[in-house]
Amino acid sequence: MRSLLLLTVLAALVVAILCYESHESMESYEINPFINRRNANTFMSPQQRWMAKAQERVREQRKPAYELNREACDDYKLCERYAMVYGYNAAYNRYFRQRRRAE
């Protein structure tokens, strides 16, 4: 009985130590995580924004075939479900390649 009481007190002490919330963990609540648009736009200069948009356009134009197939499959719910089980390549072959052969 005495060992059970000692074990309970020890467990309560461990829980209290692990659940203790220090002052450092409260710092994130003090600062507002949202900033206004004017301050948000100061992070990137217009030149950097233009470069980022240009790079994104290049990436969109030069996507590999498997990425295009995956995007087509993501837009069709049945294909997406089939892909979760058998993979995107098998799902694309089942739902889109057969249609092209039939036409």
Curated annotation (Swiss-Prot):
It is found in: Secreted. Disulfide bonds join 73-79. The keyword Manganese does not apply. The keyword Acetylation does not apply. Residues 1-19 form the signal peptide. Requires vitamin K-dependent gamma-carboxylation for its function. The modification 4-carboxyglutamate is found at residues 21, 56, 60, 67, 71. Keywords: Chondrogenesis, Developmental protein, Differentiation, Disulfide bond, Gamma-carboxyglutamic acid, Osteogenesis, Phosphoprotein, Secreted, Signal. GO terms for molecular function: calcium ion binding. Coiled coil: none annotated. The modification Phosphoserine is found at residues 22, 25, 28. It comes from the Eukaryota. One of its GO terms (cellular component) is extracellular matrix. Belongs to the osteocalcin/matrix Gla protein family. Associates with the organic matrix of bone and cartilage. Thought to act as an inhibitor of bone formation. This is Matrix Gla protein. It comes from Oryctolagus cuniculus (Rabbit).
